[in-house]
A protein has these predicted regions:
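Beta-alpha junction/loop-to-helix N-cap segments that form part of ligand/metal-binding clefts
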Residues: 26-28, 52-59, 71-138, 208-216, ...
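An alpha-beta-alpha
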Residues: 144-207, 230
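Extracellular/periplasmic periplasmic-binding protein-like sensory domains
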Residues: 148-151, 247-318, 392-395, 404-408
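Periplasmic-binding protein-like
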Residues: 100-112, 129-131, 172-177, 227-237, ...
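Secretory targeting and sorting signals
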Residues: 1-12
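Extracytoplasmic "Venus flytrap"
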Residues: 22-62, 84-90, 176-186, 287, ...
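Extracellular/periplasmic bilobed ligand-binding domains
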Residues: 124, 187-283
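Segments of small-molecule ligand-sensing domains
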Residues: 304-311, 326-388
Length: 409
């Protein structure tokens, strides 16, 4: 995969002034920070089965870093972003996290489904931004760009998706997920939640769908025989496409199908109509086609850099870098990892560069790291276009499925 990391600079990076450099030199020595620069990192899947899901994420992160450098950096310090490929592999992810620490990286932007690195990063007190993984709900050093992750507590789930599918006519749902910590935990909770959504019932659960593109014929036949009229899929986008194509081949007509990460209309042009009517959800950012200035600015900047703004994880790479920048700005003139974590934990109105449906507080809430998101902006596949809803959908209720109690609304 080609890297465009150094091609996204919109303007020459101003050099720190002599006065700024002299002032910064008075700061205590700390990992990743010099008087003239700060070293950050992106870690995730550049290769392996998850690679297509995370296409463009590191490049989008580099774009946000370049934009900040073009404005002079942070307190005169230029930002550098290093990329670490976990190869969609648990062992490799740990070694890459250890390498980032050895390289003196100040903090990381994580875009990955693999979760083996989190104890290592927590122990080293490395600030991390990203999404989905359980650590974003519990680990003090981990900051979820769209809020706390529910996957740290498999008993808690949001009614948002089920209510949306119900509004499309769904009554009997098949839940399909591949094996990753986030997908398994989220869909375990979703399965237990169905009983608390009147008019919805579980037709089938497939908890071990293969990762990535695969022959999904057997899954399609199981869904067909279950009598399901709707499907919710969580996994790598290629796996969702495989399932949709197999369902079409088996003549299965659904009232609703949701694929997490369905955000790129280019996919519709190569799927043979299998995704017609599918409900797309991003990984937490607004859809690129929505009429919001920040999304238009992001899309234009990505296009100018020769990058695909529609890639599912690309907006999260950009926002993850933005959150690292936000944390550095609130960490003080002499930033340390600890001041980054302590001060960013006090922020209650982070707006994700204007690219997320609601502002995020990093103060304790339903989870130690705050509240999970209650708003989602959906899109619908029509022909070769993904049409965003006219407005964001909010008001999701979070239910503790072990008790049936509403814990957040």
């Amino acid at each position: 995969m080609a890297f465009a990391a150094n091609s996204a600079v919109a303007a020459p990076t101003p050099a720190p002034t002599k006065a700024t450099a002299t002032s910064n030199a008075a700061c205590p020595v700390t990992p990743g920070v010099t008087p003239a620069g700060i070293t950050l990192g992106w870690i995730g899947s550049k290769t392996g089965p998850a690679a297509t899901t995370y296409l463009g994420s590191s490049e989008a992160a580099q774009l946000r870093v370049d934009q900040e450098n073009a404005k002079g950096g942070i307190n005169g310090r230029k930002l550098t972003l290093r990329v670490y490929d976990d190869a969609s592999n648990s062992t490799t992810q740990i070694s890459q996290a250890q390498k980032a620490i050895a390289d003196g990286v100040f903090g990381l932007n994580a875009n990955a489904s693999t979760v083996s690195m989190w104890p290592t990063l927590k122990e080293a007190n490395i600030p991390v931004t990203g999404f989905s993984n359980p650590a974003f709900g519990t680990d003090r050093n981990a900051f979820g760009v769209v809020g706390a992750s529910t996957s740290s507590n498999p008993a808690i789930s949001s009614t948002g998706l089920l209510e949306k599918l119900k509004s499309m006519g769904a009554t009997k749902i098949a839940l399909v997920n591949h094996i990753s910590a986030g997908s398994v935990s989220t869909f375990n909770a979703l399965q237990n939640l169905i009983q608390y959504v009147p008019g919805m019932s579980l037709a089938l659960r497939i908890p071990d769908s293969p990762q990535g593109a695969h022959d999904a014929t057997s899954e399609a036949l199981r869904i067909k025989n279950s009598g399901a009229d709707s499907v919710a899929y969580s996994g790598f986008i290629d796996g969702g496409i495989s399932l949709a194509q197999a369902l079409k081949q088996q003549g299965v007509t659904l009232k609703a199908m949701n694929i997490v990460g369905l955000s790129d209309p280019a996919i519709l042009r190569t799927s043979g109509g299998a995704l017609e009517g599918a409900l797309g959800t991003t990984y937490g950012a607004l859809p690129v086609g929505v009429n919001v200035r920040a999304m238009k600015t992001y899309a234009s900047a990505m296009k100018a850099a020769g990058l695909n703004s529609y890639s599912p994880a690309a907006p999260l790479g950009y926002i993850g870098a933005d959150l690292l920048i936000k944390g550095l700005k609130v960490a003080g003139k002499c930033p340390t990892r600890q001041s980054f974590i302590d001060n960013l934990r006090q922020v209650t109105n982070y707006d994700g560069a204007g690219m997320i449906p609601e502002k995020v507080s990093f103060m304790p809430g339903l989870f130690p790291n705050g509240n999970p998101p209650r708003c989602t902006w959906y899109s619908l596949a029509k022909g070769t276009d993904l049409i965003p809803d006219a407005q964001v959908t909010c008001g999701a209720r979070y239910i503790d499925t072990s008790t049936g109690k509403v814990v957040l609304s």
